[in-house]
Amino acid sequence: KRMIMTRKNLILLLFSLLTLNSCNKHEGPELRFCENYIQNYCQGDLVLLSRSPDRPPQIPADPQTPIRNFWIELTDCEWISPESDPQEFERLAIRNGDVGYNRWLEFWEYPSAFADNFQTMHITSNADWDEEHPAGTLLDDILWAEFWSYADYIRSGYETGGGNNVQMLVEDLKADDMQMIRDYVIIYFTKTPTIDPIHTLTVEWTTVEGEVKTASLTCRPQVNAKE
């Protein structure tokens, strides 16, 4: 009888634990009911990385190493969330029209974005790229931008699938394309330099408020370089 009671108690204990885990899954910190889709905004200084942020070293010591693309990120990022800065978070959410999501989100899928929205991007080099692109002239027509934007999804009333992958030449980017951007941008080279092989590239990214954010990277651009 004692053995039977022990087994029964064990079964009840296991059932209670399963029930408790189920409740935690819906009520715990890993799942939260969110009024806003974007849950984290990043505010910081612009930085250019020659490798993916997930693949160190991010900036090789040797600029002779050929690269086929570079990443635009923020360094010393200050994360703005409903917990860290409720007032600023609310201001950004209202600015973006992101105030009616009202759905459950798991912690690992919380969307993050640049705190700034942008109106123009321009990229130059300190060296001669080719005959059409001497030092100091815009390279916007030979650089390809790729990034994720949440703007269409939010503006559609959260009906279009989570956002859209923006892919176009830098010269074709408009202000509407550079709103509510996920927290990095990748720039690909579409031409390998034919004059000077080493370039210090400078990105000038202007916010909708008119602030110009700049960053530079010395590198060896090469279209067919290994990732």
Each PLM stretch: what is its role?
Residues K1-I4:
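Short, Lys/Arg-enriched N-terminal segments with co-localized hydrophobic residues
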Residues T6-K8:
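Elongated, non-catalytic scaffold/linker segments and compositionally distinctive motifs
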Residues L10-L18:
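Sec-dependent N-terminal signal peptides
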Residues L20-S22:
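C-terminal motif of bacterial Sec signal peptides marking the signal peptidase cleavage site
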Residues N24-E227:
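Non-catalytic macromolecular-recognition regions in eukaryotic signaling proteins
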